[in-house]
Amino acid sequence: MARPRKEAPQRNLDRDENARQQPTEEPQDEAPRNQGRQQQQQRPPAAPRRPRRFRPGTVALREIRRIQRSNVPLIPHSPFMRLVRELAAEFLDDCRFAAETFIMLKEVVEDELVNHFGNVQICSIHAKRIIITVKDFKLAKLLKGEPED
C-alpha cells in the first residue's frame, strides 16, 4: 500500500512578489554618502594613545631573552682593550698584544659572562623572583664551585 504523497503548502505568491518588487525609497533630506566621507576626513586627529604598561618585570625578562638570543658583541671594543692593557700593566712592564688576542679574549669573557648571568637568572627564578639580586650572584658562584669573596 503506497502512502499518499504530501504536498507542500501553497504559498501566497502575490504577497511575496509584491514585497520583493517594492522599491526602497531613500529619504530626500539625507546627504549623499561621499559627503559623509569628506566630513570624516575633516575631523581633528584623535589624541595619541598612551603606550601600554606592562606588569613589573615583564620588560626586563623580555630584554634578557632578547640579549640571550642575540649573538652580537655586548662589550664595547675600546673600553675592553683599555681594561686588558691596564690589567696586563700591573703584571708586566712592557706588554704588547696582537689584534686577534683582543678578539679572542673578548669572546671568551662574553661567553663566561653570559653563562654566569644565565645561572644567576636561574637562581632568581628558583627563588620565585624576577629581579636578580646580589644573593643570586653569590649562590651562582657557590654552585659553580668558586670561593666566595
UniProtKB/Swiss-Prot annotation:
Transmembrane residue ranges: none
Protein location: Nucleus; Chromosome
Bias (Low complexity) ranges: 33-44
Comp. bias regions, Basic and acidic residues: 1-19
Keywords: Chromosome, DNA-binding, Nucleosome core, Nucleus
Entry's Gene Ontology cellular component terms: nucleosome; nucleus
GO molecular function: DNA binding; protein heterodimerization activity; structural constituent of chromatin
Region Disordered: start-end pairs: 1-58
InterPro entries found in the cross-reference section: Histone-fold, Histone_H2A/H2B/H3, Histone_H3/CENP-A
CDD domains, alphabetized: HFD_H3
Entry comment describing in which tissues the protein is expressed: Pollen specific.
UniProt xrefs under SMART domains: H3 (SM00428)
Family statement drawn from the similarity comment of this UniProt entry: Belongs to the histone H3 family.
Assembly and binders: The nucleosome is a histone octamer containing two molecules each of H2A, H2B, H3 and H4 assembled in one H3-H4 heterotetramer and two H2A-H2B heterodimers. The octamer wraps approximately 147 bp of DNA.
Biological role: Core component of nucleosome. Nucleosomes wrap and compact DNA into chromatin, limiting DNA accessibility to the cellular machineries which require DNA as a template. Histones thereby play a central role in transcription regulation, DNA repair, DNA replication and chromosomal stability. DNA accessibility is regulated via a complex set of post-translational modifications of histones, also called histone code, and nucleosome remodeling.
Protein name: Histone H3-like 1
Species annotation: Lilium longiflorum
